[in-house]
Amino acid sequence: MVEHYSVLHKEVLEFSKLIEGEVFVDATVGGGGHSYLILKQNLNLKLIGLDKDDYALKVAKERLKEFEDRITLVKSSFKDLDKVLQSLQIKEINGILFDFGVSTFQLKLERGFSFQREEFLDMRMDTTQKLTAYDIVNYYREQDLYNIIKTYGEEKFASKIAKSIVEYRKKKKIETTKELADIVYRCYPPNLRHGKIHPATRTFQAIRIEVNNELKDIEEGLEKAINLLAKNGIIMAISFHSLEDRIVKNMFKKYKELKFLEILTKKPITPSDEEIKENPASRSAKLRVGRRI
């Protein structure tokens, strides 16, 4: 099994102690890391784990087998949380966790999320859906590519990158992560090519968001989750870039103003130096927590 780190797990466990009642949802169960720790700590909890990824559910089932009488795993996007709970005849929940990061095993399983190796440009969380990164890179118009890379990647060289992609694909289709990463790399001035993050990071993020409709799903999922919380129910959300964090922050603020939610994290909680050293991928993680009033 591929190793999977649970980001900010100590902090998540601390806030999980506040959960009253017994229904908890892991909206992004992934490899089951957070779920395992929460089930071990909160002995009365029954857990519903959601994921769009078949392989993630397989990994989670294996990871959580000692708790099999307390877990229900469902293949679903968290944007359909209301439908999932309805099918399970559950009216409200006592706690929910969202972790918007790409799982370590997804990065290692040659699904096109990583530019560290030569992989087919896929990037689908749900491998049964049709749209892939290959389709976007090879068939979207230059203007649409620019909009995606600029908006979802907050990439300052978006115009040059979109233009270079279109020029390159006139000669041959862009098929692999390495090809795309090299195109982006060459769009950066030589003095900016060796910064903290690889030049292709933002472009890959942008295309992944487009493939999986991530930001719209996050907004929808958070809204439904807050409305399904029982009194004193806890919502925890871990984001990995400013676009995700902004959605969480604004959604919490909206429901605070509606006197519906108390925000328990004045500022987002970030990983300790120790955690970043152990798991460098956690460096950009931010945790925000709210409680239903």
UniProtKB/Swiss-Prot annotation:
Name of the protein in question: Ribosomal RNA small subunit methyltransferase H
SUPFAM superfamilies in the record: Putative methyltransferase TM0872, insert domain (SSF81799), S-adenosyl-L-methionine-dependent methyltransferases (SSF53335)
Role: Specifically methylates the N4 position of cytidine in position 1402 (C1402) of 16S rRNA.
Chief localisation class: cytoplasm
Binding-site list for S-adenosyl-L-methionine: 32-34, 51, 78, 99, 106
Gene Ontology cellular component annotations, sorted alphabetically: cytoplasm
Keyword rRNA processing: yes
Lineage: Bacteria, Pseudomonadati, Aquificota, Aquificia, Aquificales
Molecular function GO terms recorded: rRNA (cytosine-N4-)-methyltransferase activity
Family the UniProt entry places it in: Belongs to the methyltransferase superfamily. RsmH family.
EC numbers on record: 2.1.1.199
